[in-house]
Amino acid sequence: MSETVLPNHLIHFSETSLLKLPPSLYKTCKTYLNQEDIKKIQKAYSFAFYAHAGQKRKDGSDYITHPVAVTEILLELKMDPDSVCSALMHDVLEDCNVQKNNLAKIFGDDVAHIVDGVSKLGKIETKNIADNNANNLQKMALAMANDVRVVLVKLCDRLHNMRTIEYVPRKKQIQKARETLELYGPLALRVGMQDIRAELEDLSFRCIHPMRAKMLEN
């Protein structure tokens, strides 16, 4: 097998010298995964940590806090190790100049497929939902995903982004909330994720109609 050539910013990543998982991730992982699985997840965390080095979230926190939070949500669903690895690395193709074949060589074809699917699914967000039938968009998303694990990782990604949407400019908040109502809420229903669907819809409503949401609370 030929040597895997990674971008320069991943020079510190080593499969033989891995970073420790954040305590919250490790604690949940060990409740249902074996040590071999956890080591693979540790490798994915190390890869994501170095891939996102220097990147920041809108709130000023290190970007790696986002994939970690997404993974914490996914772990609540007791997902398989490849899904967990994919959640940790779900943004590396889009944001870090990493190639799909890099992931396939290091983590296997399944992980590469899921991460690539999440990246492609995210591109639907750039379409103008007003110009498309929402049901058709949902069907397109499911067809593009071709694997329910892709949809689940993307739903967890969107859920964390909606939980932290206050740091995004107001115009983009509205856009993301409408996308969530039109696409991700119904997608969650289609794959049986009722709790995620309910929270996505609640967060979207609060974003679009903050005053009405406050009135309903009182």
Residue ranges of model-derived segments:
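Active-site helical microenvironments for divalent-metal-assisted chemistry
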Residues: 1-218
